[in-house]
A protein has these predicted regions:
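Active-site-flanking structural segment that lines cofactor/substrate pockets
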Residues: 49-73
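Canonical Radical SAM [4Fe-4S] cluster-binding loop centered on the CxxxCxxC motif
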Residues: 64-66, 70-109
Length: 386
């Protein structure tokens, strides 16, 4: 990234940076000059003992981009099935077809579920599920068509790169062909799940039956080429190391340079409960905050960094708004995947509660749609300012 001039306010605020870590001072010089950080810089950010200085730098970038604005949305999760052939060691959600607790929603059931929950008009359906060995592509196309017919104003963010790849193999057509069919059915954008960590070594341990990192990235490229924006995630806090994390983010950054199709980066803390990796400890609050900060500093071409309150608790998410995050996600009505892995956060939060959390953190709430456009609410409906 080329150096660009700073505003007087940015120059003045940069003078507040303090640290005894000489390596961080060198990184700060690059950040203030808006020069791109490299792999070694990423390792330095992870290794520095001065986490407050790392957070300060990330917050400086965040406020340079967004000021005090913090984005949130009113969204509902729909998980049509938990039947999955992948058997990932990181997952507590997936089941085999005959397992106790396995389910697959009938289409009418899924459409009905979309209308239940809090009595607030949702602006987004977030749809992800397992890799079901028997469900045809047409099931998912009909699911989306039915939602669009019943809720034409609601943005449908559906199906991870992993799911799209699996559907392509089952239907014996190409990934771009599946994406075109999904888009024609009514999919508006895609979530960022399934990325985990791109390292082959790590994936062999935690998700060896899932597509590799290269295919995940190429599927994202194909989606972006068709005009489908997506998010990007990184699952951390299991068997990966700092090098794996930095490599993951730089590979995302490279694709973003080419496509510009990623909307936000979402670091996801691993929840080990009820998984084959439950012997591993959970991440600490400091680890979560550092990850938010490093993501903000390395991913200079991502507009948004999300502190997903369901994963890190509402309290840590509030602090993360001072460590580089500008988005706290949404109401997340009926989240299942992380709660099966032991998440103790509520399975949803009211719009008013999100607004309160953001204001208590000293930030300004901004209700957005999935594409980060402002949402204007009436008593029981909404419009999007285009």
């Amino acid at each position: 990234m080329e150096s660009v001039s700073l505003s007087e306010a940015q120059i003045e605020s940069s003078r507040g940076f303090r640290t005894d870590d000489e390596r961080l001072r060198s990184i700060a010089d690059k950040v203030f000059a808006k020069q791109r950080l490299d792999f070694e810089d990423g390792l330095t950010l992870y290794g520095s003992s001065d986490i407050l200085a790392v957070g300060w730098l990330a917050n400086w970038v965040r406020e340079s981009l967004h000021g005090d604005i913090t984005y949130f949305n009113v969204n509902r999760h729909i998980n049509p099935t938990n039947v999955c052939v992948a058997a990932c060691r990181l997952c507590a959600f997936g089941r085999k077809k005959d397992d106790v607790g396995a389910y697959t929603m009938a289409l009418e059931e899924a459409w009905t579920a979309a209308a239940t929950g809090y009595h607030e008009a949702v602006t987004e359906f977030h749809i992800v599920g397992g890799l079901h060995p028997d469900l045809p592509l047409e099931y998912f196309l009909d699911l989306v068509r039915g939602l669009k017919e019943r809720f034409p104003k609601v943005h449908i963010k559906a199906f991870t790169m992993v799911e799209v790849s699996f559907l392509a193999r089952r239907a014996k057509i190409s990934i771009p062909e599946v994406l075109v069919k999904l888009k024609d059915a009514g999919v508006d954008s895609m979530p960022g799940g399934g990325a985990e960590i791109f390292s082959d070594r790590v994936r062999h341990i935690i998700c060896d039956h899932k597509i590799d990192g290269g295919e995940w990235l190429e599927t994202a490229r194909a989606a972006h080429k068709l005009g489908l924006r997506s998010n990007a995630t990184m699952l951390y806090g299991h068997v990966e190391n700092d090098e794996d994390r930095v490599d993951h983010m730089l590979r995302l950054r490279e694709v973003q340079d080419d496509t510009g199709g990623f909307q936000t980066f979402i670091p996801l803390a691993f929840h080990p409960d009820n998984t084959p990796l439950q012997h591993l400890p959970r991440t600490t609050g400091l680890t979560d905050l550092r990850q938010i900060a490093v993501g903000r500093l390395l991913l200079d071409n991502f507009a948004h960094i999300k502190a997903y309150w369901q994963m890190m608790t509402a309290g840590i998410a509030q602090v993360a708004l001072r460590f580089g995050a500008d988005d706290i996600d949404g109401t997340v009505i009926e989240e299942k995947i992380y709660h099966d892995a032991g998440a103790s956060t509520p399975q949803g939060m009211r719009r008013s509660d999100l607004i309160r959390l953001i204001r208590e953190a000293g930030r300004e709430p901004f209700e957005r749609d999935t594409l980060y456009r402002p949402v204007i609410r009436t008593e029981d409906s909404f419009t999007v300012a285009v």
